[in-house]
């Protein structure tokens, strides 16, 4: 029995060693990378980057899809993925501040303008007093939306709010609009809500129901927006070869052409 136990223990130890060795190889493999993206239009763009990465750089890109803005950074921080491509710098900065993530940008992708959409009105002149306006509830995209509402004259924010105003910073509201904060994935569905007259939606989610800023937006964020999307990884992974190869693949003409096709001209090159 003692002999058998030693044999099984040795076999178990060998299997464990091989498993650990395999994990180490996967983590350091310069020709493989796991990248988190948001399901939908951005996923389609990333799939082109995936193809370019394989053909030009011999890099196998495994895309991991998410349905919200919170989980991709959580997964990256835990080491479940090697990089993600979905967020702009103000959002990344806020996540780092709030959650203590050790994440860093390694490349820029595109600006995807936010816009105001509606199934109830065709112009802001038709927006009635007391109407409900839906906006994303995460701090950076909420601020981005409020700044856009101010730019088109619907509200006025107090001076000095920078990029992160909240509803409490509204000092003038001529139409007595009711700002309704929702999770970003819920915003497209809010357009069918009888109570919601207008919704400010990120291009990523608007495209999931066939909407584009240039064609369907009642008002659209300027193309000189500071909210360029980023490729992000962990600080201890920023110099990895697989990350560098993926950035090169993403910042290619093929991906730029695909983004413009997917977003009907709504993607602006950020690099």
Curated annotation (Swiss-Prot):
Keyword Hydrolase among record annotations: no
Keyword set, alphabetical order: Amino-acid transport, Cell membrane, Lipoprotein, Membrane, Palmitate, Signal, Transport
Highest taxon of the lineage: Bacteria
Lipidation (N-palmitoyl cysteine): 23
Localization annotation: Cell membrane
Signal peptide start-end: 1-22
Lipid-substituted positions (S-diacylglycerol cysteine): 23
InterPro entries: Lipoprotein_NlpA
Topological category with respect to the lipid bilayer: Lipid-anchor
Gene Ontology biological process terms, A to Z: amino acid transport
Matches recorded under NCBIfam families: MetQ/NlpA family lipoprotein (TIGR00363), PRK11063.1 (NF008285)
Additional remarks: The MetNIQ system is also to be able to transport the toxic methionine analog alpha-methyl-methionine.
Functional note: This protein is a component of a D-methionine permease, a binding protein-dependent, ATP-driven transport system.
Name used for this protein in its record: D-methionine-binding lipoprotein MetQ
Organism of derivation: Salmonella typhi
């Amino acid at each position: 029995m003692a002999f058998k136990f030693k044999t099984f223990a040795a076999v178990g130890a060998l299997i464990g060693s091989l498993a650990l060795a395999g994990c180490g190889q996967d983590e350091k493999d310069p020709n493989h990378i796991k990248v988190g993206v948001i399901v939908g239009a951005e996923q389609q763009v990333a799939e082109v980057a995936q193809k370019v990465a394989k053909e030009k750089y011999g890099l196998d890109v495994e895309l991991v899809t998410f349905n919200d803005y919170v989980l991709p950074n959580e997964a990256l921080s835990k080491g479940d993925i090697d990089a993600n491509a979905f967020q702009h710098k103000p959002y990344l900065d806020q996540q780092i501040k709030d959650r203590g993530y050790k994440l860093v940008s390694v490349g820029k992708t595109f600006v995807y303008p936010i816009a105001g959409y509606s199934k109830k009105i065709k112009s802001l002149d038709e927006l009635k007093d007391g109407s409900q306006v839906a906006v994303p509830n995460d701090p950076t995209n909420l601020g981005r939306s409020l700044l856009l509402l101010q730019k088109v004259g619907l509200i006025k924010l107090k001076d000095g709010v920078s990029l992160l105003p909240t509803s409490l910073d509204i000092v003038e509201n001529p139409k007595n609009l009711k700002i309704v904060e929702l999770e970003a994935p819920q915003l497209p569905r809010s357009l069918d809500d009888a109570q919601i007259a207008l919704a400010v939606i990120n291009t990523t989610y608007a495209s999931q129901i066939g909407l584009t800023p240039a064609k369907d937006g009642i008002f659209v964020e300027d193309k000189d927006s500071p909210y360029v999307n980023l490729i992000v990884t962990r600080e201890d992974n920023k110099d990895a070869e697989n990350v560098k190869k993926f950035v090169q693949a993403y910042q290619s003409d093929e991906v730029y052409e695909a983004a413009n096709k997917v977003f009907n001209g709504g993607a602006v090159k950020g690099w």
